Design a protein with these regions (language model features):
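Conserved RNase H-like, two-metal-ion catalytic cores of nucleic-acid enzymes
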Residues: 3-42, 74, 79-177
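Short secondary-structure boundary/capping segments
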Residues: 111-113, 189-202, 310-313, 390-397
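Non-catalytic nucleic-acid-binding interfaces of large nucleic-acid enzymes and RNP effectors
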Residues: 1-74, 197-225, 264-265, 270-271, ...
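Short glycine-rich phosphate-binding loop at a beta-alpha junction
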Residues: 175-183, 308
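Helical catalytic core of nucleic-acid polymerases
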Residues: 380-519
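Common nucleic-acid-contacting/processivity interface regions adjacent to the catalytic cores
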Residues: 15, 24, 271-392, 396-402, ...
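Active-site-proximal helix-loop-helix substrate-binding element of RNase H-like nuclease domains
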Residues: 131-135, 141-157, 174, 178, ...
């Protein structure tokens, strides 16, 4: 099973790390699908209707050439692993990391890119060996190198020596997953930019088993890609899996709240602590990775990420984006069923990338602190998935929608019940999607005739006015139904393991049922 995947766009080469086979380097020519007017030998059905035949010929501008816009990583993971369910790698090399720097200016994105202050220490925990490692600049020779009680302290005479020893240790540990806290914003970008200044790009590339570390500035955020290593930010995972807002996302506050382990207190600032009590500074640096270790022991967010990623066939670093998770899961399902996926609308019409249409989502009332009486809290189980299933939502089942009128969005309710309360002679505009070109056509219809069409064809209609067929279950509904059934399956296995006091299986099945709950 894959542990990491990287596609080199310059050499058109995949680099995939497998838990049994190690590194696999290969090129792959995908199969595209050409839409045809009628069925031919070898043709497969298109999700939105019609037929398509396989071809190896790529044409960027052909709107009838399908599955040409699938992300390279999603494509290869689908091709190699679409038959596998609920399978995760047998092992991972997981390393926790935290860096400390001399205090300078505010840690803005611009400051991090300039990386003006030296790195003073780097703390690591190797999950495989349980070893704690702290590399620290000790210019005055106050401490000796020690390696006992699973704690390795490595003093260095200079920042450059620290960087060299860190890179050697990093290569030795060979992590498949690198985890920090707020590390997507600070630790990893600062490490990249500072190392680039002090030792150069060639040395920075030692962070990658493929010798390729890349920087991109996307949406104003620092993003560092270490080819072959999955970098996960535990703060972002916490925000994903703990959906309620925390009063503070500082590591010490989260550690204190969830595992009763906070940061080490000190007087003054880190610069004075480093100067006056270097051993306390070491403990301070190690405490940060110890908090991450304790959080994972309780919350299991890394294990959850691994499981969800393999259920959906996505790279681990895509876990933060629900759209990628959904796309991976749908591509996997369609591949199994022999159904061809349509291209994204932006593939046919790039101008849609700049089309920022807004629509109303859930209405959230800002809570007002205070003491209240006679309060009812209704928590609907799996509300959005249940809506998808009950309405049979899907692009292939979408019939059309009632065009939004001039009224505020929340005053519009086009459910069948509400339509029947309106004047049957009232005229509304119906928009219909061309599922081949993704263009919209419209026509006008009386509400009375619309109600008859809905009832005669057994369409569902949402409050927003979107109408869906029910003669065939949508792919989204099928996937969700499968996930519901899987969760119940693992909940049963978990209960059985608990009765048998098989706690290893109990924890494993609990993780699986939790993964399907999140999905």
């Amino acid at each position: 099973m894959y542990q990491s995947v990287y596609y080199d766009h310059q050499t058109y080469t995949y680099h995939l790390r497998d838990d049994k086979q190690g590194w696999l380097d290969f090129q792959f020519q995908p199969t595209f699908w050409k839409r045809v007017e009628e069925y031919q030998d070898g043709a497969q059905p298109i999700l939105t209707g019609g037929w398509a035949i396989p071809t190896k010929k790529y044409d960027k501008y052909d709107p009838d050439l399908l599955e040409k816009d699938i992300d390279k990583s999603l494509l290869i993971l689908r091709e190699l692993y679409y038959k596998q369910d609920d399978v995760v790698p047998l092992w991972h090399n997981i390393v926790y990391i935290d860096i400390e720097i001399e205090i300078g200016g505010a840690l803005t994105p611009e400051y991090i890119r300039s990386a003006p202050m030296p790195i003073t220490s780097i703390a690591l925990i190797d999950v495989t060996t349980k070893q704690k490692i702290c590399l620290i600049v000790d210019k005055t020779g106050q401490i000796q190198e020690t390696n006992q009680d699973s704690k390795h302290i490595i003093p260095c005479k200079s920042e450059k020596e620290l960087i060299g020893k860190f890179l050697s240790k990093f290569e030795e540990l060979d992590p498949t997953i690198l985890v920090g806290y707020n590390s997507a914003y600070f630790d990893i970008p600062y490490l990249y930019f500072r190392l680039s200044q002090v030792v150069g790009e060639d040395e920075v590339n030692r962070l990658s088993p493929l010798k390729k570390v890349q920087y991109s500035d996307f949406n104003g955020e620092n993003q560092i890609k270490i080819a072959g290593v999955n970098h996960l930010d535990y703060m972002l995972l916490h925000k994903k899996y703990i959906m309620k807002e925390e009063p503070s996302y500082k590591l010490g506050d989260i550690g204190t709240k969830y595992v009763d382990l906070g940061k080490i207190e000190y007087e003054g600032n880190l610069n004075t602590l480093f100067r006056d009590d270097i051993n306390a500074f070491i403990d301070y640096n190690l405490r940060d990775v110890e908090i991450i270790e304790a959080l994972e022991a309780k919350l299991k967010f890394i294990n959850l990420t691994i499981m969800i990623s393999h259920i959906c066939n996505i790279p681990y670093e895509s876990i933060y984006w629900n759209t990628v998770m959904n796309e991976g899961a749908m591509l996997k399902y369609l591949k199994r069923e022999g159904i061809i996926s349509p291209n994204k609308p932006t593939t046919h019409n790039p101008n849609l990338r700049n089309f920022n249409e807004t629509y109303a989502g859930g209405f959230i009332l800002e809570p007002i602190p205070g003491l209240y009486f006679d309060v009812i809290d209704l928590d609907f189980t799996s509300l959005y998935p249940s809506i998808i299933k009950s309405l049979n939502l899907g692009i292939e089942t979408l019939v059309g929608r009632i065009k939004v009128d001039h009224r505020p969005t929340y005053e519009q309710n086009h459910s069948l019940e509400k339509l029947k309360e309106r004047d049957p002679n009232e005229i509304v505009t119906i928009e219909k999607l061309n599922k081949k070109t993704y263009s919209m056509s419209s026509s006008q219809l009386s509400i009375g005739k619309l109600i008859k069409i809905i009832e005669d064809n057994k369409f569902t209609i949402s409050a927003s006015g979107a109408m869906f067929r029910t003669d065939e279950q949508s792919v989204c509904s099928k996937i969700l139904q499968g996930w519901f059934e899987k969760r119940e399956h693992y909940r049963g296995l978990k209960k059985k393991a608990g009765k048998e006091e098989n706690w290893d299986d109990y924890k494993l099945y609990d993780l699986f049922q939790h993964a399907f709950k999140i999905l």
